[in-house]
């Protein structure tokens, strides 16, 4: 890639050097005068494509993209020799964002085609001479084509790397502590089954019972299990079993009086038992040949490291957009960790990180993700958790750590606390924006005295 970018730098530099200065000046003049119009027209046309629309439907994104597009047009069409290296880096950065969000390369290519199409009448409606118009158009189109090539090549490289990480994460997830995960999920679905059966046998209210897809097991399967075992036939079988039983469950919940009829009650209980039994059999088959593998895991805390953060965020954001379900993030910092580490030593610091990590695991669901983000900072991705549920989870974790007892080597008690920033997904497709606003909330929590939870609001 380095050699390629050097070659493109030489080509772009050559294009700028060969163009007459008055022609370059006129191209820059066109860009400055018409960038706003070109940006608006560009997104108007691009949004007609339904595939592109899904990436541009967020109002905040559209507003930011329009202003970014204006700057991009001015930068590319006003390029001087000294600007070329910086412009190549800009294309690389834009490509990384596109890959991170998951914008397909064909949408990017369509965008460049649209830009060149709408630029033509703008240039040829100017009061330049016919020869000047042709030269300005030639310089502008070649500049855009070089920028497009650099961006597309960088995008393909980033997207390919992301695809490899997606597959690496799938394999890691499949292999990581598989036996324990299998037993945990079997216990989860059995607990759900027992809860419903007891309520039916004791004539208790079923109103608080959840359909299988919304129970802990169902959430784990939809957010993790499907991905772990992608492409294996048993996944489809489990999906159908969950879907079919949810239909029966919802129908029963609409008229619970039917359960007073013994034959209907027995039929419903057998449907529960058969569904759970089949799912457990299929789960055992899926996990049967899986063994432990720890690539992608933080050795000290046994949490995920940040390697798979893009893969998971991209998938969960796509799921949230597709289903309309909530998604939230907690960024967590151990208060005064450096001071504790410096005072009591690294062994004590490591023990604190292990205890804090255990508090995370004990207070999240199996469908959530916990990462060691770096040092004493952690990220938790909460799937299908409302704002209230997100804050309750954060407060539970904070309270648990505050009550954790830890003694230094000399017997002195060490006080532990966490500052937590929370943020709800608001439709912006770039996960780094979600992390950024959660980080802003974390900063507020620290500024307001630490040992507290703050939820990001636009007014913060």
Swiss-Prot record:
Biological process according to GO: cell adhesion involved in single-species biofilm formation; negative regulation of bacterial-type flagellum-dependent cell motility; response to oxygen levels; response to stress
Residues holding Mg(2+): 333, 376
Documented effect of changing residue 43 to A/L: Same biofilm formation activity as wild-type. Large decrease in O(2) affinity
Induction of the gene: By RpoS in the late exponential growth phase and upon entry into stationary phase. Expression is higher at 28 than 37 degrees Celsius. In rich medium DosC and DgcM are the major RpoS-dependent GGDEF-domain containing proteins in the cell, whereas in minimal medium it is the major RpoS-dependent GGDEF-domain containing protein. Highly expressed on solid medium. A member of the dosCP operon.
Keywords: GTP-binding, Heme, Iron, Magnesium, Metal-binding, Nucleotide-binding, Transcription, Transcription regulation, Transferase
Class of this enzyme: transferase
Catalytic activity, reaction form: 2 GTP = 3',3'-c-di-GMP + 2 diphosphate
Annotated ranges, domain GGDEF: 325-458
Regulation: Activity depends on O(2)-binding and heme redox state: the Fe(III), Fe(II)-O(2), and Fe(II)-CO complexes of DosC are active forms, whereas Fe(II) and Fe(II)-NO complexes are inactive forms.
Binding site for substrate: 341, 350
Subunit structure comment from the entry: Forms a complex with DosP.
Protein's recorded name: Diguanylate cyclase DosC
Organism: Escherichia coli (strain K12)
């Amino acid at each position: 890639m380095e050699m390629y970018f050097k070659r493109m730098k030489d080509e772009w530099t050559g294009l700028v050097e060969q163009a007459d200065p008055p022609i370059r000046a006129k191209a820059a003049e066109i860009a400055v005068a018409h960038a706003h119009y070109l940006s608006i027209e560009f997104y108007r046309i691009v949004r007609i494509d339904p595939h592109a629309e899904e990436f541009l439907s967020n109002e905040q994104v559209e507003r930011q993209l329009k202003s970014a597009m204006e700057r991009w047009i001015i930068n590319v069409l006003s390029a001087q020799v000294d600007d070329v290296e910086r412009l190549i880096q800009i294309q690389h950065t834009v490509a990384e964002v596109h890959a991170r969000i998951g914008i397909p390369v064909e949408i990017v290519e369509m965008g460049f085609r649209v830009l060149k199409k709408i630029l033509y009448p703008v240039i040829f409606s100017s009061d330049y001479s016919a020869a000047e118009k042709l030269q300005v158009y030639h310089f502008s189109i070649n500049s855009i084509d070089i920028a497009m090539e650099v961006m597309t090549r960088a995008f393909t490289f980033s997207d390919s790397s992301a695809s490899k990480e997606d597959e690496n994460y799938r394999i890691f997830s499949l292999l990581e502590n598989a036996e324990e995960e299998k037993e945990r999920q079997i216990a989860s679905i059995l607990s759900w089954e027992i809860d419903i059966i007891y309520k039916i046998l004791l004539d208790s209210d079923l109103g608080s019972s959840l359909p299988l897809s919304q129970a802990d097991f169902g959430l784990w399967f939809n957010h993790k299990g499907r991905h772990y075992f992608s492409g294996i036939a048993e996944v489809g079988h489990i999906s159908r079993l969950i879907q079919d039983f949810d239909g029966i469950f919802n129908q029963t919940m609409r008229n619970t009086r039917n359960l007073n009829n013994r034959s209907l009650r027995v039929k419903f209980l057998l449907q529960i038992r058969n569904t759970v039994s089949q799912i457990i059999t299929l789960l055992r088959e899926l996990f049967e040949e899986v063994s432990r593998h720890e690539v992608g895991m933080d050795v000290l805390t046994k949490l995920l490291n940040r390697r798979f953060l893009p893969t998971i965020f991209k998938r969960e954001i796509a799921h949230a957009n597709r289903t309309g379900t909530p998604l939230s993030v907690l960024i967590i910092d151990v208060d005064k960790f450096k001071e504790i580490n410096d005072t009591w030593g690294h062994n004590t610091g490591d023990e604190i990180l292990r205890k804090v990590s255990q508090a995370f695991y004990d207070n999240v669901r199996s469908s959530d993700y916990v990462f060691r983000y770096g040092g004493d900072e952690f990220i938790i991705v909460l799937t299908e958790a409302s704002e209230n549920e997100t804050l309750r989870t954060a407060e539970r974790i904070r309270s648990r750590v505050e009550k954790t007892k830890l003694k230094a080597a000399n017997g002195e008690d060490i006080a532990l606390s966490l500052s937590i920033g929370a943020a709800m997904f608001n439709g912006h497709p770039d996960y780094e924006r979600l992390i950024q606003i959660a980080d802003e909330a974390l900063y507020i929590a620290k500024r307001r005295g630490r040992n507290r939870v703050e939820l990001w609001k636009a007014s913060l």
